[in-house]
Every structure is written in structure tokens, then in C-alpha cells.
Amino acid sequence: MNCLQLLLVLLLISTIAALHGDGRVPQRRGRNIRTMSNLLNFQTRDCPSSCPAVCPNQNECCDGDVCNYSNTLNKYFCIGCGSGGGE
């Protein structure tokens, strides 16, 4: 989760907490609580299991994925479908 996503989650949580404190949150009537990804409207797509998780040559990632360098781990990783994919 990147910093922007974390800030959005914290903002959402603080807004919900503030509304609960004021008693302004409407009661749910038979609806399930939506997942955080639905609340943040993340796009999902079908990802093949053959997508690599790492990209040492910076060109191994599946279409639509981004090869990103981690300073902490000194490695290139595929971000997107390949994250944790079929390495």
C-alpha cells in the first residue's frame, strides 16, 4: 500500500469515526459491509498466474504491470498483477 492509499484509508476511518461520534451515520438495513477496495474504488483485472514477481532486467513484467526498484531490498519488483505472482 503506498502513502497516498494509506492516507485515503486514514481519512476514511477518521471521517467514519467523526460521524459515529455525532450520531449521524445512518443505520444499515440488511446490507453487507463493503470491502475496503470497493470503498476506495480500486480497479481489478484478471491476472495470469504466470506473471513474474521480480524483473531483474526491467522487462519481464506482464502487460500493464510496472517494474519498480526497491531501495530497501535492492531488487526490481513487478507492481500490478505480477506482485507475488508465479516466481
UniProtKB/Swiss-Prot annotation:
The keyword Disulfide bond applies. Residues 1-18 form the signal peptide. Keywords: Calcium channel impairing toxin, Disulfide bond, Ion channel impairing toxin, Secreted, Signal, Toxin, Voltage-gated calcium channel impairing toxin. It is found in: Secreted. Contains 4 disulfide bonds. Residues 19-34 form a propeptide. GO terms for cellular component: extracellular region. The cysteine framework is XIII (C-C-C-CC-C-C-C). May interact and inhibit Cav3.1/CACNA1G calcium channels. In a ex vivo model, shows ability to block nerve signal transduction. This is Conotoxin QcMNCL-XIII0.1. It comes from Conus quercinus (Oak cone).
